[in-house]
Each structure stands twice: as C-alpha cells, then as structure tokens.
Amino acid sequence: MKKNYNNIFIVDTKAYFDAMVLYYDVQNDLVLTYDFALKKYVEDLGGNVQYLDHLVDIDKMQENNYLIYKFFTDWHYDKDGNDIFTFKDVPFGFSFRLDFWNDFVFYTRIFLSLKCISRYSFQDIYILSDEKLIFQILDTFDIKYKIFYDKSSVIDNTGYYFPIAKWLDSKIRPIGFRGFLYKTREKVSFIYGKIMPFVDKLFKPNSKYTVFIQDYHPTKRIIQHFRNDNNFTVLLEHFSRFSNKKDNLKERLLPIGGDIKNYEQIKNELLKKFESNRFHRLILSDGSDITDAIYDIIKNRISSGLSKKLLTLDSCIKYLDKNKVDLVILIANMGHTVTLFDLVCKYKKIPSYLIINGMLLNNYQDEAHYATYINSYSNSIKENYFRDIKNVYALGDPRMDTYSLIEKNKINREMPTITIGASGFNSTDLNSYVAVEFDFLYDILKAFSVLKQKGEKFKLIIKVRPNGYEKQYQSFINEYFNDLKIETISTIPMIEVLKKTDFYISIYSQTLFEASCLGIPVVYYKKDTEITNKPFDNNSELVTILNTDDMIQAFYDFKANNQRYELFLNSKVMEQYIGFLDGNNLMRNIDFIYKILRKESLK
C-alpha cells in the first residue's frame, strides 16, 4: 500500500460514495470505507481502497488486544484496588462490561486505524459518514478534513457490513415494541417471583437445594433435569425458553422490581466518586494515551443505566437476605441480572459453576474466568485459554450429546448439498472488521461460480448467523452471484440444516465439529485475521483454506473423497478440542454439580 495520495475519501458506503464520485481521481486518491460493496467497486476501477477499520498490522493489533483487556479488567478499581462501584458492601463494577464493551473496542480500533493516516502524504480528506467517532478522532490528531453534507441523492445507505451498533441496541438497549415486551416480561417475572415463595410455604415441601441457573443453550437440559427433581428448586431470571407452561410453573423466578427513582441519589454519588477516584490508564503500544476518551465512553454508557443496575442489585441482595441459594450455574460472565446476582452470591460466599458457551479461543480475554468452578469442555481450552488453572475441569458440552445419538449422513458426492455457515464480525477483537462476513462469502461463492462454469453440479445453502441480517445476504447474492441458485436460512436449527448437508464450510465455529460428528467433511475458510488457538490456527488436523483457488481444489478433493478430510472426522481428534463426544456430557455435568452441592471431592 502506497503512502502518497492527492486526496483521501472516508465514506461509509457505496451509496454515499456515489454522491461524491465526481470529485474522485481513481489514479491518485485513496478511499477508506466499512463497506464491502464500495471496496470492491473501487478495486474493480483499479483504484486504491482499504477497509477503514482494518488498516493496522495484525501483530500490532494483537499486542493492543492484551493492553485494552488489561484495562477492561481494571478500570473500575481505585488506586488501592477497591471497586469504586460498591453498594451495600457488594462490589459491582464488573457488571458494566456489556454496557460499553463494543464502544470501547470499536473506538480503539478506529483510533489506531485513523492514526495511520497521519503517516500518509495527502492534500485533503473528504468525509461523508454518519459515524461521529471519525470526526472526533481526527480532531484529536489535529488532522484537517472537509465534510460532504449533500446526501439528497442517497435513497438507501445500507452497505455490506455488519451494523454492530444497531444490533447491540436491539439486544441490550431495546426500544419500541421490543422494549415493551422486555418490560412486560420483567413485570410478569417480578409478580411471579414475589408470589411463589408464599405459595411454596403453604403447599410445597422444602427442597434440599436451590440452584440459580442462567438459561441458555449449554444449560437447557440441566434446567430440565433439576426441574423434575423434587430435591431441587430451580431459580431463573425469567421463565425458561421453549418450555411448556406446566414445566414453567415448576420454576421459580427472581423478583426484580421497585421504584427506580429511589436510586437516583446513590447513582449521582457513585458517578462523582468515579470521576474523582478513577485511577487506571490505557496507553496503547505506540504510546498513545486514550484514557480520557475511553472513560468518557464508559461514563456515557453506564450513566443512563446505573439506576437500573442499583435497583436490580438491591433486589438481588434483598432476595438473598431472605432466601437460601446453594449454587449459581452460569454460561458467561455477562448479562444484566445474572451478573449482578452472581456478584451478590460471591459476596455471600455462594459457589458458582460456569459451563462455557462455545469455544473460547482468544487468550487475551478473561471472559468466563470468574467462577468457583469452570467447565472448559476440553483439555485444549483448559490448557490454552485458561492456562491450566486448578479450578477448571474438562467435562464436555452437554449440547454435543445430541450428535452421538444421530445417524451419520450419507454423503452425496455426485450432487452434493454444500452449506456455508456465515462468518461474522467479532466486536471484541481489534483484528476483526465489520465487513468480514461479506469478504468471506464473496470468496467462497466466487469459487462455486467458477465451479459451476466448469460444469460442476451442487446445491448451495447459506446458514445465516443468529445475529445476521438475512435480507443483507439476499441482496448480496442478487448483486454479485445471480448466476447461482442459493437458499438462505436463518431460523431453522443448525442440526436440521446439517442433516441435509454433504459438505460444510464455515469460520472458526463449533458448528464445524457438529458437522464432523455427522460424518460431513468440513472446511475452515480463514478470511478472518484474528489470532486464535487450535484447531483454528492453520496448524491442525482441520482442513483450512485461505483463498478462492484453494477452495476450488478443496471441493475437487471432497468429490474425490480425498483423505485430507479424514482426520477431522475422527472423534478422538475432535475430542482434543471440543471435549467428550460419548453422549454422556449432560450426566457428567450433573454429577459434577451434585458433587459441588454435597461438598465431595471433585477429582
């Protein structure tokens, strides 16, 4: 990439670029964008273009990953190591992570990328963007720029990249009808949680154990098991998903409620304390000090939700002051109510057991480290991600038991069904970028477009991730690959998609193991630039492909039943990375939970 340009254009999408294209010199200008469509358009013109959020060397970004996550761990402690955010003696600064995590990493990523511009030679920077952060950071560097304001010709500004802010707002800051549904659920849970302890005293014999369980995929069958055991009371945040009403009535819920106005004064006192007592600094590998900017992000995000945090925390404290809980079962160190409840339990010396939610592969993070006992699935994850710490046990993923019971697929190599498990932006890794899923998809579909032209026959399915936008994919296919007949699927369970699959291609995903368990040859197409542990390090038994030409050859090898796929179809090989595949993971975890409760030896 050259360093000398006439002008630099920073543009969100191709639609915006079309509004300013008359000012663009293909030979001498540089375009920076988030959008796959614009990057491809400029490349096809022969111009200079890069992803705005992907300008920095991979190793340099990885070095900064470690630095930002050290700060992420420490930011809420004062100079003496005390949590600034403490209420009724319960420290709860840890609970804010999800509130600002994406903003924090995104700012750092864009800061490091835009700093590269200061090393370029250019006359002017022209910007047409809705991202205020770009202007803020350029001002920090004292880099002058010119703004395009005329968007009148732009009808649809949707690009081919993941709208992370939109998605996060819909999930953790819901508004509108979705927000109404969330509030309704909270009210129902509060009323039920308040009433049932009194009903139980009249009609239900005391159970021996009360276990709070975070409801998600790894714990689904654990909830079902203990719900049917009269020795247990299963305590949840809300009614378990996808259960019938009869089973829901066996569950007990945390009564979280009260008047949020009662916590405004405490909120203001804590924010003042935060301003005066914050201590830790974030200095990046190049010496840049972004502490103040990051603290502004944190304060902006936590201020609006702090009263609700306090209300929830107080509800948890009041509940545990009156009720017995013997164990907390988690799937992550995230979630508003779950994390706060766990923090109160920690304060009260109540143990916790965490079953990781999917494979943990990035060693710079500390997610899922905070529990009394941890199930890492496999020895590989225990040794690499958890550094072989003593409270981690390789007990397998209960979800994988399903695959031991299913008959393996009969692979059709004449007219195969090829499923592509869509890629996705990793908002927590500096080395990820928002257009990666479309970079990934273009490469693979380009390979199959070439194969079709050569007379190969196949069916194509794209399995969109749960956080993906299916309409984006359909538009992408129509624009670039209308020669291919492709089915897009978003809501059908993965196992049902895999049952009709002969060849599976995906990113670093547990679904590659799920496919292999069904006898399906798999490919890890590494378009991502993240540094991950085995088997996704391009140095394992997993067939790993880096470019379109090799993808074409991988398909021919699949057709020829080449032995390169055999190793990763071997359950003993897979078990190194994913844990036991013997169908006994559920009972292995349940037995471990019984041992914790009975205070038996865990060896």
Give names to the regions the model predicted.
Residues M1-K603:
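Catalytic-core helical/loop segments in enzymes performing group transfer/polymerization on anionic/lipid-linked
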